[in-house]
Protein backbone atom coordinates (compact mmCIF):
# COMPACT_ATOMS: atom_id res chain seq x y z
CA UNK A 1 0.00 0.00 0.00
CA UNK A 2 1.09 3.54 -0.63
CA UNK A 3 0.14 6.36 1.74
CA UNK A 4 0.79 9.97 0.81
CA UNK A 5 1.30 12.60 3.51
CA UNK A 6 2.57 16.16 3.58
CA UNK A 7 4.83 17.76 6.17
CA UNK A 8 7.64 20.27 6.61
CA UNK A 9 10.63 17.93 6.35
CA UNK A 10 12.88 20.43 8.12
CA UNK A 11 10.62 20.50 11.20
CA UNK A 12 11.24 17.61 13.60
CA UNK A 13 7.78 17.85 15.18
CA UNK A 14 6.11 17.69 11.76
CA UNK A 15 8.11 14.60 10.83
CA UNK A 16 7.36 12.96 14.19
CA UNK A 17 3.64 13.71 13.70
CA UNK A 18 3.82 12.23 10.21
CA UNK A 19 5.27 9.00 11.59
CA UNK A 20 2.59 8.91 14.28
CA UNK A 21 0.06 8.85 11.43
CA UNK A 22 2.04 6.16 9.61
CA UNK A 23 2.23 4.06 12.78
CA UNK A 24 -1.57 4.24 13.08
CA UNK A 25 -1.97 2.90 9.51
CA UNK A 26 0.74 0.23 9.52
CA UNK A 27 3.28 -1.41 11.81
CA UNK A 28 6.07 -1.69 9.26
CA UNK A 29 7.41 -0.20 6.05
CA UNK A 30 9.47 -1.65 3.21
CA UNK A 31 11.48 1.42 2.24
CA UNK A 32 12.34 5.01 2.98
CA UNK A 33 13.42 7.30 0.16
CA UNK A 34 15.00 10.48 1.50
CA UNK A 35 14.58 12.92 -1.38
CA UNK A 36 14.44 16.23 0.44
CA UNK A 37 16.74 19.01 -0.60
CA UNK A 38 17.28 22.59 -1.62
CA UNK A 39 19.97 24.05 -3.85
CA UNK A 40 21.26 26.55 -1.32
CA UNK A 41 23.21 29.69 -2.19
CA UNK A 42 25.73 30.25 -4.97
CA UNK A 43 28.98 32.10 -4.34
CA UNK A 44 32.40 31.93 -2.80
CA UNK A 45 32.39 31.03 0.87
CA UNK A 46 33.51 34.51 1.94
CA UNK A 47 30.39 35.99 0.31
CA UNK A 48 27.85 33.60 1.85
CA UNK A 49 25.89 34.20 5.04
CA UNK A 50 25.47 31.81 7.94
CA UNK A 51 21.67 31.62 7.58
CA UNK A 52 21.92 30.19 4.05
CA UNK A 53 24.62 27.73 5.14
CA UNK A 54 22.63 26.53 8.15
CA UNK A 55 19.37 26.33 6.22
CA UNK A 56 20.97 24.26 3.46
CA UNK A 57 22.35 21.82 6.03
CA UNK A 58 19.08 21.73 7.96
CA UNK A 59 16.96 20.92 4.93
CA UNK A 60 19.43 18.68 3.09
CA UNK A 61 20.94 16.74 6.01
CA UNK A 62 18.98 17.16 9.23
CA UNK A 63 15.68 16.30 7.51
CA UNK A 64 17.20 12.96 6.48
CA UNK A 65 18.03 12.35 10.14
CA UNK A 66 14.42 13.09 11.20
CA UNK A 67 12.98 10.66 8.65
CA UNK A 68 15.59 7.94 9.08
CA UNK A 69 15.34 7.99 12.87
CA UNK A 70 11.58 7.45 12.64
CA UNK A 71 11.74 4.87 9.84
CA UNK A 72 14.33 2.51 11.34
CA UNK A 73 11.98 0.95 13.94
CA UNK A 74 9.39 0.26 11.21
CA UNK A 75 12.02 -1.27 8.93
CA UNK A 76 13.26 -3.44 11.79
CA UNK A 77 9.68 -4.66 12.40
CA UNK A 78 9.60 -5.60 8.73
CA UNK A 79 12.77 -7.63 9.30
CA UNK A 80 14.53 -5.69 6.57
CA UNK A 81 14.04 -3.13 3.89
CA UNK A 82 15.79 -0.30 2.17
CA UNK A 83 16.78 3.29 2.83
CA UNK A 84 17.66 5.27 -0.27
CA UNK A 85 19.25 8.66 0.28
CA UNK A 86 19.36 11.12 -2.58
CA UNK A 87 22.72 12.83 -2.61
CA UNK A 88 24.37 14.32 -5.69
CA UNK A 89 27.45 14.22 -7.83
CA UNK A 90 28.38 17.15 -5.58
CA UNK A 91 28.55 14.59 -2.75
CA UNK A 92 31.49 12.79 -4.32
CA UNK A 93 33.47 15.61 -5.95
CA UNK A 94 34.05 19.30 -5.45
CA UNK A 95 31.44 21.78 -6.62
CA UNK A 96 32.85 25.33 -6.97
CA UNK A 97 30.61 28.19 -5.80
CA UNK A 98 28.22 25.70 -4.17
CA UNK A 99 30.03 24.82 -0.93
CA UNK A 100 26.95 24.56 1.36
CA UNK A 101 25.21 22.28 -1.13
CA UNK A 102 28.33 20.17 -1.64
CA UNK A 103 28.92 19.91 2.12
CA UNK A 104 25.35 18.73 2.64
CA UNK A 105 25.60 16.11 -0.09
CA UNK A 106 28.98 14.83 1.20
CA UNK A 107 27.33 14.50 4.62
CA UNK A 108 24.56 12.38 3.12
CA UNK A 109 27.11 10.04 1.53
CA UNK A 110 28.96 9.71 4.86
CA UNK A 111 25.80 9.01 6.83
CA UNK A 112 24.68 6.51 4.19
CA UNK A 113 27.93 4.54 4.46
CA UNK A 114 27.72 4.57 8.26
CA UNK A 115 24.08 3.49 8.36
CA UNK A 116 24.78 0.69 5.88
CA UNK A 117 27.33 -0.68 8.34
CA UNK A 118 25.04 -0.21 11.35
CA UNK A 119 21.83 -1.55 9.83
CA UNK A 120 23.09 -4.40 7.66
CA UNK A 121 22.70 -6.86 10.53
CA UNK A 122 18.96 -6.05 10.48
CA UNK A 123 18.77 -6.76 6.73
CA UNK A 124 18.24 -3.07 6.06
CA UNK A 125 20.09 -1.89 2.95
CA UNK A 126 21.20 1.72 2.88
CA UNK A 127 22.34 3.28 -0.38
CA UNK A 128 22.85 6.72 -1.85
CA UNK A 129 22.05 7.86 -5.34
CA UNK A 130 24.50 10.52 -6.53
CA UNK A 131 23.11 11.79 -9.82
CA UNK A 132 24.59 14.49 -11.95
CA UNK A 133 22.65 17.44 -13.27
CA UNK A 134 18.90 16.88 -13.05
CA UNK A 135 16.80 18.88 -15.50
CA UNK A 136 14.22 20.99 -13.68
CA UNK A 137 13.34 24.26 -11.99
CA UNK A 138 16.05 23.94 -9.33
CA UNK A 139 18.80 23.70 -11.96
CA UNK A 140 17.36 26.66 -13.85
CA UNK A 141 17.88 28.73 -10.69
CA UNK A 142 21.34 27.28 -10.00
CA UNK A 143 22.47 27.99 -13.57
CA UNK A 144 21.03 31.51 -13.46
CA UNK A 145 22.73 32.28 -10.13
CA UNK A 146 26.10 30.88 -11.17
CA UNK A 147 26.02 32.74 -14.51
CA UNK A 148 25.18 35.97 -12.70
CA UNK A 149 27.95 35.44 -10.12
CA UNK A 150 30.56 34.66 -12.81
CA UNK A 151 29.18 37.25 -15.26
CA UNK A 152 28.94 34.67 -18.05
CA UNK A 153 26.09 33.34 -20.16
CA UNK A 154 23.60 30.86 -18.78
CA UNK A 155 24.30 28.68 -21.82
CA UNK A 156 27.99 28.36 -20.89
CA UNK A 157 27.12 27.38 -17.32
CA UNK A 158 24.55 24.87 -18.57
CA UNK A 159 27.19 23.31 -20.87
CA UNK A 160 29.60 23.08 -17.94
CA UNK A 161 27.06 21.23 -15.78
CA UNK A 162 26.10 18.80 -18.54
CA UNK A 163 29.78 18.10 -19.32
CA UNK A 164 30.29 17.00 -15.69
CA UNK A 165 27.83 14.11 -16.17
CA UNK A 166 29.44 10.84 -17.26
CA UNK A 167 27.09 10.55 -20.24
CA UNK A 168 27.26 14.29 -21.06
CA UNK A 169 23.50 14.71 -20.89
CA UNK A 170 20.77 15.86 -18.57
CA UNK A 171 19.27 13.47 -16.04
CA UNK A 172 15.50 13.61 -15.64
CA UNK A 173 13.37 13.12 -12.53
CA UNK A 174 11.92 9.97 -14.09
CA UNK A 175 15.44 8.50 -14.24
CA UNK A 176 15.83 8.99 -10.50
CA UNK A 177 12.44 7.39 -9.85
CA UNK A 178 13.50 4.33 -11.86
CA UNK A 179 16.66 4.03 -9.77
CA UNK A 180 14.55 3.94 -6.61
CA UNK A 181 12.07 1.33 -7.81
Residue ranges and their predicted role:
Residues 88:
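Residue(s) in the substrate-gating loop at a strand-loop-helix junction
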Residues 43-45, 49-54, 161:
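Substrate-binding pocket helix/loop in short-chain dehydrogenase/reductase
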Residues 73, 117-121:
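Alpha-helical segment proximal to the catalytic Tyr-Lys
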Residues 128, 152-181:
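C-terminal helical subdomain
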Residues 45-46, 93-99, 121-122, 168:
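Active-site loop immediately N-terminal to the catalytic Tyr-X3-Lys motif
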Residues 68, 104, 112:
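Active-site helix of classical SDR
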Residues 6-17, 50:
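The beta1-alpha1 cofactor-binding region of Rossmann-like NAD(H)/NADP(H)-dependent oxidoreductases
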Amino acid sequence: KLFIYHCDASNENDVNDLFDKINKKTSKIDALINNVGISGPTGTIDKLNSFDWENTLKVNVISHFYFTKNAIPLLKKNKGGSIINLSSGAGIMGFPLRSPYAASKWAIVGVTKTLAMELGKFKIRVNAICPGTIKGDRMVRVIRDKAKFLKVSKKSVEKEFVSMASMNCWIFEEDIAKMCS
